[in-house]
Regions:
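Conserved, well-folded catalytic cores of nucleic-acid-processing
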Residues: 57, 92-96, 117-123, 151-158, ...
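ASCE P-loop NTPase helicase motor core
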Residues: 240, 334-459
Length: 459
């Protein structure tokens, strides 16, 4: 009860111990809410009654009462966008499984984050059921981490940002830096003599990690560029400075690393942004874009995967040019339409491809987007992360495969290149689909637009 009151900034009475916990007015909390499955008792949405019922359902002194998930929120999103992101993640990953989620968002400018407290028992119209042991498995936790990255990246793309989150370890990302430690204490208090010993030790460990990371980047500035462009393919000087400050020990080391990166031959200056701000990338990203273009041009020039005109069919002629292009020859196609038109056109194309012996599969960056693609078009769909895992395990697309990627405008350069490489290896057809209004909202040129220009799509 005390933890629930503290996180939500609420006043709650603990019936078991007869104690009232009052954290009303606690600073930094910008939103708190309880989300639960439909058709549940009204008391579930009352924080005090909910957590008193949770405590009453457990009899052992060492019982686990709840699970806490903490997620960092992208600083690029505004408060309304962050709330929408957290709600979608909770609804898809937790509430849909029968959990109750009591969450709050803390809105510090440098570290916005959300605390999500989950019940361990499913809830129905009759109340709490038995504890769900399968919610505790490592595979489930890994799925939650991957799902958070997918959902956050989807929302970042919707808001027009190119920055991306990667849930994998730095080692898996092939980034030669050590992960930092979460300190759990405000920066202003870190020199406080009254800090408990475990926090002092944690701070010392973080200082050591920052020093070693700084030494690594000083010895090889390309490490910094690889790590930064993995998050931000195009970055400003301010973003470079922010990145290096958080990964170096002190001002002297920071300035030395910054100078080394600026003098690095792998740093590439780009044309200034619309606001006049200088922008940069790395030679590795430039070569990745060239590779993407070469592959797209090669795939577009291939014959095959066409449906004869007399076997195409279509219920309306509103998208005839786009429809004919999709069903024509070539192993890569792009499509930009409003959501409603896109769904109707893809559903018609799906029927035509399937009727001509092709296997049509769908994918999207997030679980929600994949589900929407499947329900609106009938194309069986999975997340892109699930497909990538399949490809890493040896699974391949085949010559009769058509892979439809929705929300393509939000994909990063390396991820889009991996998808096209998988289609290219199997001689499959890749169909990249973007929503017109979302493509227009992108604050930087997207890899999707690069592909579209490379294959000269006009209709």
């Amino acid at each position: 009860m005390a933890a629930a009151a503290y996180r939500a900034g609420d006043l709650l009475r603990d019936e078991r111990y007869g104690v009232t916990h009052n954290y009303v007015g606690k600073r930094g909390i910008v939103h708190s809410e309880i989300m639960a499955p439909e058709l549940i008792p009204a008391w579930v949405r009352d924080r005090e009654r909910l957590w008193n019922r949770v405590e009453a359902a457990e009899f052992r002194k060492d019982s686990q009462l709840a699970r806490v998930v903490e997620v960092g929120l992208p600083i690029e999103l505004d408060a309304e966008e962050r709330l929408a992101l957290v709600r979608e993640y909770i609804a898809t990953e937790f509430v849909a499984q029968g959990m109750v989620a009591d969450f709050c968002i803390r809105g510090q400018a440098h570290n916005p984050h959300a605390h999500i407290v989950l019940t361990l028992r499913g809830v129905t119209a009759e109340g709490f059921g038995p504890k769900q042991r399968n919610w505790n498995g490592k595979a489930v936790l890994h799925r939650w981490r991957a799902a958070w990255a997918e959902c956050a990246n989807d929302h970042l793309a919707r808001a027009g940002h190119s920055v991306r989150i990667d849930h994998r370890t730095l080692e898996a990302q092939q980034i030669e830096l050590m992960p930092g430690r979460r300190i759990g204490v405000a920066r202003a208090r870190r020199n406080d003599a009254s800090l408990p010993e475990h926090l002092v030790e944690r701070l010392a460990e973080q200082q050591r990690i920052a020093r070693e990371n700084g030494d690594t980047m000083l010895a090889d500035p390309t490490v910094a560029l690889r790590a930064l462009t993995h998050q931000r393919p195009i970055f400003t000087e301010a973003e470079l400075i922010q990145f290096l400050r958080s990964r170096t020990e002190d001002t002297n080391q920071f300035e030395a690393v910054l100078q080394a990166v600026k003098l690095c031959s792998e740093l590439v200056s780009l044309a200034a942004g619309k606001d006049g701000t200088a922008r940069f990338t790395s030679r590795d990203m430039v070569e990745a874009e060239r590779s993407l273009v070469r592959r797209a041009v090669t795939m577009a020039s291939r014959k095959g995967h066409s449906v004869p005109p007399e076997r195409r069919g279509i219920e309306a002629d509103a998208w005839r040019d786009a429809f004919d292009d999709l069903l024509g020859e070539g192993d890569i196609k792009t499509l930009v339409l409003a959501d409603h038109d896109k769904s109707a056109l893809l559903a018609a194309a799906h029927r035509a491809w399937a009727a001509n012996g092709m296997t049509v599969e769908g994918t999207a960056p997030s679980r929600r987007a994949a589900q929407l693609l499947e329900t609106s078009t009938g194309i069986k769909s999975r997340t892109l992360a699930e497909y990538e895992s399949q490809w890493e395990s040896g699974g391949e697309l085949g010559r009769e495969s058509v892979l439809v990627l929705d929300c393509a405008q939000g994909l990063g350069l390396k991820q889009l290149e991996r998808l096209l490489a998988a289609a290219d290896r199997g001689r499959a057809k890749a169909v990249l689909v973007a929503q017109a209004h979302k493509l227009g909202a992108m604050k930087v040129d997207s890899p999707f637009a690069t592909v579209q220009r490379a294959i000269n799509v006009e209709y």
